[in-house]
Design a protein with these regions (language model features):
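Retroviral integrase
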Residues: 1-166, 223-229, 234-339
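Charged alpha-helix within mobile-element recombinases
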Residues: 1-5, 133-217
Length: 339
C-alpha cells in the first residue's frame, strides 16, 4: 500500500476481545470486601440554616461493592485529603473494612473541566497519595488504580455515578441543600439504588420474590416510611421538608423508569429472543409507584401470535390477574441463570 492510499484509509484504534469477569466479582465474600470508589460533583451546599445565603462546593463519594453491586454514598465537603479520609472512615465504620479499594487515576480527567479536574488533584499529588495509602496500610487495605486514560476499566462504579448523578441533578435543579438535607437525600437515594431487583430468588411461581443488593446489607428488602405524594405539587406550596420529599419522589420516578428500560433489550424489534414462558417472574412498568416499591408479577399464560412469537402475556399479581404487552414488563434472570 503506497503512502497516499494509506493516508486516505481511516485509522482504527486497536481492539481485542473483552476480558473474563474479574475473580473478585464472582467469589463469595462479604459486601464491600472489594470496593470501587469515585467522586460525583461538584454540588452546591448551603452553610448554616436553610435560609442562609452562604454556599460552598461539595462532592459525593460513591462506594460500589464489586460482588453485590451495593452502593454507599458520603458527602465530602472539600477536596482536601482529610475530607476524603473522613468519608472513608465513615464508610468503614458502617460497612466494614474492605480488603481492596479501586479508584480512577487522576490523569483520566486531564482534559476535563476545571471543577472536575480539581476533584482529582488529590489523586495526582504524591504526598496526598502517600497519606491515603498510609491510612489504608494501617487498616490492612490495598488501594489500586485503574490504568491512566482508561476510564472503561472502572465501568462498575462509573455506571453507579452516572445512574445517580444524572437524575440527582435533574431533581435538585437550581435548589441548594444544607449538609443535613443532602445527607438525608443521599441516604434515601442510596436505598433506592440498593432496592433494585437483580434476579428471581426461586423458580417457584407461587413465591414471586427477587434478590436485591439490600438483601446482602440488611438481610431483607429495604423499606421506607410512607409519605404523601408531592410529585406534581408546586414548590411554593411546600414546606422545606415536603420539598425534600418531592425531590426524592421525583428522583425515584426518573431513576426507576430508566432502570426498567435498561432491563429490556433495546434490539427487541430487530432481533428475536426466546419467548417468555409461564412461571417467569417479571417487573411491571407502571407509573406513580411508591419509592422502593417494585411491582412484581408471575406469568400464568402466554398468547403467541400467528407467527408463534409471544407479545402478550397473562400476569398474576396480589391484586388480580390481567393481560399485558411484553413491552410493559421486564423479566428478571431466573434462579438457574436463565432469562
Amino acid at each position: 500500500m503506497d503512502f497516499v492510499t494509506a493516508a486516505n484509509e481511516p485509522v482504527q484504534p486497536a481492539s481485542t476481545c473483552a476480558p473474563q469477569t474479574v475473580t473478585t466479582r464472582v467469589q463469595t465474600s462479604s459486601p464491600f470486601l472489594t470496593t470501587g470508589v469515585d467522586y460525583a460533583g461538584p454540588i452546591s451546599l448551603r452553610l448554616g440554616p436553610p435560609r442562609s445565603k452562604t454556599t460552598t462546593k461539595g462532592n459525593i463519594a460513591i462506594f460500589v461493592c464489586f460482588v453485590t453491586k451495593a452502593v454507599h454514598t458520603e458527602v465530602v465537603t472539600s477536596l482536601y485529603t482529610e475530607a476524603f479520609l473522613a468519608a472513608l472512615r465513615r464508610f468503614i465504620a458502617r460497612r466494614g473494612k474492605p480488603m481492596t479499594i479501586c479508584s480512577v487515576n487522576g490523569t483520566n480527567f486531564q482534559g476535563a473541566a476545571n471543577e472536575l479536574h480539581a476533584i482529582y488533584k488529590m489523586l495526582q499529588c504524591t504526598s496526598q497519595i502517600a497519606t491515603v495509602q498510609d491510612f489504608l496500610a494501617t487498616e490492612e487495605c490495598e488501594w489500586k488504580f485503574i490504568p491512566p486514560h482508561g476510564p472503561h476499566f472502572g465501568g462498575l462504579w462509573e455506571a453507579a455515578v452516572k445512574s445517580m448523578k444524572y437524575h440527582l441533578r435533574r431533581t435538585l435543579g437550581s435548589q441548594v441543600a444544607t449538609y443535613e438535607e443532602l445527607c438525608t437525600l443521599l441516604a434515601e437515594i442510596e436505598a433506592c439504588l440498593n432496592s433494585r431487583p437483580l434476579c428471581a430468588l426461586s423458580d417457584d411461581p407461587f413465591n414471586p420474590t427477587y434478590l436485591s443488593p439490600g438483601h446482602f446489607l440488611v438481610g431483607q428488602p429495604l423499606t421506607q416510611l410512607p409519605a404523601a405524594d408531592f410529585t406534581d405539587v408546586k414548590c411554593n406550596r411546600l414546606s422545606r421538608w415536603q420539598t425534600y420529599q418531592q425531590q426524592l419522589q421525583q428522583f425515584w420516578q426518573r431513576w426507576s423508569s430508566n432502570y426498567l428500560q435498561s432491563l429490556q433489550q433495546h434490539h427487541r424489534w430487530q432481533r428475536t429472543s426466546p419467548n417468555l414462558q409461564s412461571g417467569y417472574l417479571v417487573l411491571l412498568r407502571e407509573d406513580n409507584t411508591a419509592s422502593l416499591h417494585w411491582l412484581t408479577a408471575v406469568i400464568t399464560d402466554i398468547h403467541p401470535g400467528k407467527d408463534g412469537i409471544v407479545r402478550v402475556v397473562t400476569l398474576r399479581t396480589p391484586k388480580g390477574t390481567f393481560k399485558r404487552s411484553i413491552t410493559k414488563i421486564c423479566p428478571l434472570p431466573r434462579a438457574n441463570g436463565e432469562l
